[in-house]
């Protein structure tokens, strides 16, 4: 311990079993012997130090000595894990000066254009967890007002450089990304084994759900382990030409994960922030060719063709700057893709498509083939225009299913439950007619309310899509849940608004049987 630390008040670290998300939180007793709580008022920012190890945290004060004693400093689970010192270690606690990069955040809020070094400083502090959630929100709101092209490039570069940077000894490394917002839509899990079976390299890293009922990583986790580190990831790709793993475990663009955790609840999703998020991870992942799926629809993230064009140009601009060949494709975002919404239900759809099951969702199959065909066109040895036919050949021959099983075997077994929720309720059509609309956002909300993705077997199974004829009382979809209270909440919300429109009329409580 340094002489400076020794002169400061010392407290013993104690782990508090409290999940505070991404924010570092420390707790002291109001009767602390080493600190004066009246000086360290609640929600103060403090610096915790032991030797050369330091961390900023938000300080809370408790009157419960059973939680934190007078000689203790409690660290919530995320802070305890990041600080990396054993329970009982002595630490010093002092008021923390705000990160110097906050001056740049204030400048952005006031309308100033930031320099590349200023953006780099902000991203470095974000990645080191030196910002509170309120400070992160301030940066996001400032950036949402406007962002120049130079600021965007600087943000992509800074976010890609602070985490793991993967490099592959292969000339063509393909990737695909969907901007999200569409329930189901588990095309990556179908196209990765198709592309890998052909022989192209596709090391797919995916996210977990934040505000949706399932991310690709949540769904793949039903079939295989996804918390794979970099060395093991490279072994899997060497053996299988591809993988389907959780990106958070390989630490690609960690600052982006922190920004997303705050911007999603605030519904901040500007074009520039979206492009910076996606492109920073693809740059860090070592991708040479990227296909971006832009679903277009009234309840999708992209509503109009003009919005899609603007987003396409932004992706191409950033891709050109960093040497990544970017292609965007506009797809149908009017309704969910596949029949399942929720990890287990979506995994069932994927395996049905790969297994050429006649009952597999045709929309998921066709979209996956279309996207896979575009990726296969990046193979210089494949005749131009034959990508779709090659993708279909690999699927129908069983080669894609065999490759998926190889990926699953190499990633290892999962401990996740694969059973569906035991509590089920059918939501039925209010009248005879034709389904004329489906609200993606509402179905996402209903599936989450039912327990997905925490309960992987919770969610929604769709029986009807846009254009289907229905009779009064015929099931539109089934809600699956494990917990009675979650089932009750989901059913109540569905009765209030089912998310379906029949002959142009929304289904409300009085119309549901």
Swiss-Prot record:
Its EC number is 2.4.2.4. SMART domains: PYNP_C. Gene3D superfamilies: 1.20.970.50, Nucleoside phosphorylase/phosphoribosyltransferase catalytic domain, Pyrimidine nucleoside phosphorylase-like, C-terminal domain. The keyword Transferase applies. One of its GO terms (cellular component) is cytosol. InterPro entries: Glycosyl_Trfase_fam3, Glycosyl_Trfase_fam3_N_dom, Glycosyl_Trfase_fam3_N_dom_sf, Nuc_phospho_transferase, PYNP-like_C_sf, PYNP_C, Pyrmidine_PPase_CS, Thym_Pase_Put. It comes from the Bacteria. It catalyses: thymidine + phosphate = 2-deoxy-alpha-D-ribose 1-phosphate + thymine. Keywords: Glycosyltransferase, Transferase. One of its GO terms (biological process) is pyrimidine nucleobase metabolic process. One of its GO terms (molecular function) is thymidine phosphorylase activity. PANTHER family: THYMIDINE PHOSPHORYLASE. Belongs to the thymidine/pyrimidine-nucleoside phosphorylase family. Type 2 subfamily. This is Putative thymidine phosphorylase. It comes from Rhodopseudomonas palustris (strain BisA53). The lineage of its organism: Bacteria, Pseudomonadati, Pseudomonadota, Alphaproteobacteria, Hyphomicrobiales.
């Amino acid at each position: 311990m340094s002489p400076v630390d020794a002169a400061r008040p010392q407290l013993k670290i104690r782990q508090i079993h409290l999940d505070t998300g991404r924010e570092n939180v420390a707790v002291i007793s109001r009767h602390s012997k080493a600190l004066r709580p009246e000086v360290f008022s609640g929600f103060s920012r403090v610096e915790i130090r032991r030797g050369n190890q330091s961390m900023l945290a938000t300080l809370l004060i408790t009157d419960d000595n059973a939680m934190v004693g007078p000689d203790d400093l409690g660290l919530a689970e995320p802070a305890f894990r990041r600080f990396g010192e054993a329970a009982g270690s002595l630490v010093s606690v002092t008021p923390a000066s705000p990160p110097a990069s906050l001056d740049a955040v204030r400048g952005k809020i006031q309308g100033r254009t930031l320099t590349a070094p200023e953006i780099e400083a902000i991203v470095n502090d974000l990645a080191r967890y030196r910002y509170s959630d309120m400070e992160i929100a301030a940066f996001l709101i400032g950036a949402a007002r406007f962002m120049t092209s130079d600021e965007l490039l600087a943000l992509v570069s800074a976010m890609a450089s602070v985490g793991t940077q993967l490099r592959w000894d292969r000339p063509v490394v393909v990737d695909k990304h969907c901007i999200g917002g569409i329930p189901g839509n588990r095309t990556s899990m179908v196209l990765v084994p198709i592309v890998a079976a052909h022989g192209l390299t596709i090391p797919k890293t995916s996210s977990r759900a934040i505000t949706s009922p399932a991310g690709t990583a949540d769904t793949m986790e039903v079939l295989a382990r996804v918390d794979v580190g970099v060395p093991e990831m490279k072994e899997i790709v060497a053996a299988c030409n591809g993988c389907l793993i959780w990106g958070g475990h390989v630490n690609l663009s960690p600052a982006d994960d922190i920004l997303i955790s705050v911007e999603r609840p605030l519904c901040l999703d500007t074009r520039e922030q979206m492009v910076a998020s996606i492109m920073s991870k693809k740059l860090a992942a070592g991708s040479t060719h990227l296909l971006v799926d832009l679903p277009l629809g009234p309840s999708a993230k992209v509503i109009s063709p003009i919005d899609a064009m603007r987003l396409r140009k932004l992706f191409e601009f950033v891709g050109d700057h960093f040497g990544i060949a970017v292609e965007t494709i506009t797809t149908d975002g009017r309704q969910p893709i596949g029949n399942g919404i929720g990890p287990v239900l979506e995994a069932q759809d994927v395996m049905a498509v790969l297994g050429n099951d006649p009952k597999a969702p045709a929309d998921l199959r066709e979209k996956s083939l279309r996207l896979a065909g575009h990726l296969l066109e990046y193979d210089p040895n494949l005749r131009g225009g034959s990508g779709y036919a090659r993708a279909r050949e690999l699927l129908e021959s069983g080669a894609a299913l065999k490759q998926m099983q190889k990926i699953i075997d190499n990633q290892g077994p999962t401990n996740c439950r694969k059973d569906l929720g035991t509590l089920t309720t059918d939501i039925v059509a209010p009248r005879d007619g034709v389904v004329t609309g489906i609200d993606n956002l509402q179905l996402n909300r209903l599936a989450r309310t039912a327990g997905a993705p925490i309960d992987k077997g919770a969610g929604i199974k769709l029986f009807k899509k846009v254009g289907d004829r229905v009779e009064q009382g015929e099931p539109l979809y089934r809600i699956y849940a494990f917990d009675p209270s979650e089932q009750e909440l989901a059913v109540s919300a569905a009765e209030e608004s089912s998310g379906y429109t029949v002959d142009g009329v929304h289904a409300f409580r009085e119309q549901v049987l």
